[in-house]
Regions:
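N-terminal cap/lid segment of alpha/beta-hydrolase-fold proteins
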Residues: 1-37, 395-397
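Cap/lid segment of the alpha/beta-hydrolase catalytic domain
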Residues: 33-107, 156-157
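Accessory cap/linker subdomain of secreted extracellular hydrolases
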Residues: 59, 67, 133-231
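Alpha/beta-hydrolase fold nucleophile elbow
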Residues: 110-122
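Short glycine-enriched nucleophile-adjacent loop
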Residues: 125-136, 253
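Short beta-strand/loop motif that positions the catalytic acidic residue
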Residues: 232, 238-240
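Conserved alpha/beta-hydrolase "acid-adjacent" motif
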Residues: 244-250
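C-terminal, loop-rich substrate-recognition/catalytic regions characterized by aromatic stacking residues
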Residues: 278-408
């Protein structure tokens, strides 16, 4: 890590032509330090527009890295923002192929050392994992936050195999609106109107395709790390939150990936850890700079001395406004070597072999929705009062529950 912070040079009007002639729009964030390069580079590929929707967020991320001698490249996916073409689906083979072409272009630039990383939160995290599965030349490290291992059973489509109805009425509809916005004429120049009309007329709705695939088939296995954990060789930093819908995937990847890896799980929802709700927050940019500094530049910064998993353990009472009570716990292995089977009697032997409870249909409707953590009540007592609940007497000693517990009744 450099001892001084470099000035940053930003260029929002960078374009790279794909092998089929479609032009993608990029923004580069470069260390402005004469004679100090070339630099490693970190790439992020998103459909969320780099020139307006995500500009402030991108600047915060890539200026931080560039000041520390790591170039940043932010890409608008084909058919979004400043990029031409049409986006036909999320995480399509075309999208990942485009990303590999962008990586190759970045590696050839005079300001780049050829040592590449990728990062992202949610879509960008998926993109980093899926690109790493193809092992493109030069890609040595990734950071994937709030991403999952299984596009079918652990994403926003069919959670556990059941249709995720709440997200299907929200997520794909919002993407129709976002994909329908015009490119910025000040960025793409002449031809912006024709790009926009083509986008409006040609971009399909995604939901019908998802509904045609209601079981784990090749459509969902594409881009799912669980289909081949061994395909990812790049050093992988995983970041998640206990109130996020993708934390199960983080734990599965931490256990099954073979590459150098570390993970952090905080109390947040689907947020950037540095501003996550509920607090405490976590400086993910500092950790990212260390991760990429070590794996792309060879910095001896101790990042691989961190425990395999650093996780926030909630304690009672768990929440105080927007703050979560608890402490950080370090695990050198995953699953934990000291895990035990915990046996407690919840009742007595009875002749009945089943229990039935017909509760009101609104149970659970007032709890915070997935991807909306930090909004609404976190007190489960009203739902408990209208549900079938199995509970013990007060425990005699503290008990940490960490990971994916299995309960046998």
């Amino acid at each position: 890590m450099p001892s001084t912070l470099y000035p940053v040079r930003i260029d929002r009007r960078v374009f790279v032509t794909m092998s089929d002639g479609v032009r993608l729009g990029l923004t580069t964030y470069l260390p402005d330090a004469s004679g100090k390069g070339p630099y490693p580079a970190v790439i992020e590929s998103l459909p969320y527009r780099k020139d307006d929707d995500c500009y402030t967020r991108d600047w915060q991320t890539y200026a931080y890295l560039a000041q520390r001698g790591i170039a940043g490249v932010r890409v608008d996916i084909r058919g979004t923002g400043a990029s031409g073409g049409v986006i036909n689906d999320e995480y399509s083979p075309q999208e990942i192929a485009d990303t590999c072409e962008v990586l190759a272009w970045v590696a050839e630039q005079e300001w780049c050392s050829g040592d590449l990383g990728m990062w992202g939160i949610s879509w960008g995290g998926f993109s980093a994992l899926q690109t790493a599965m193809l092992r493109p030349p030069g890609l040595k490290a990734i950071v994937a936050a709030h991403a999952t291992h299984d596009r079918f059973a652990s994403d926003v489509h069919y959670v556990g195999g059941s249709l995720h109805a709440a997200e299907q009425g929200d997520w794909p509809v919002s993407m129709i609106a976002l994909n329908g916005l015009p490119p910025d004429p000040d960025i793409v120049g002449e031809g912006w109107f024709e790009m926009w009309i083509d986008r409006l007329e040609s971009t399909p709705q995604w939901l019908p395709r998802w509904l045609r695939h209601q079981s784990r088939d090749d459509y969902w296995l594409h881009g799912s790390p669980c289909a081949d954990y061994g395909a990812i060789e790049a050093a992988t930093l995983l970041i998640g939150g206990w109130l996020d819908g993708y934390v199960d995937g983080l734990l599965a990847m931490l256990e099954h990936l073979h590459c150098p890896r570390r993970a952090v799980i905080g109390p947040w929802g689907h947020h950037r850890p540095a501003t996550g709700v509920p607090a405490p927050t976590y400086d993910h940019l500092e950790l990212m700079a260390r991760w990429f500094g070590h794996h792309l530049r060879g910095d001896d910064n101790g990042v691989m001395d961190l425990p395999l998993l650093t996780a926030w353990i909630r304690t009672a009472p768990p929440y105080d406004g927007d703050r979560c009570h608890g402490y950080w716990r370090a695990e050198p292995t995953w699953p934990p070597a000291d895990r035990v089977i915990w046996e407690r009697s919840l009742g007595r032997l009875e002749h009945r072999d089943s229990l039935t409870w017909h509760g009101p249909q609104w149970v659970g409707a007032h709890a915070p929705a997935w991807d909306r953590a930090g909004v609404g009540s976190r007190d489960p007592h009203a739902d408990d009062a209208n549900s079938m609940v199995f509970e013990t007497l007060p425990l005699p000693d503290p008990l940490d529950i960490l990971g994916l517990p299995e309960v046998e009744l």
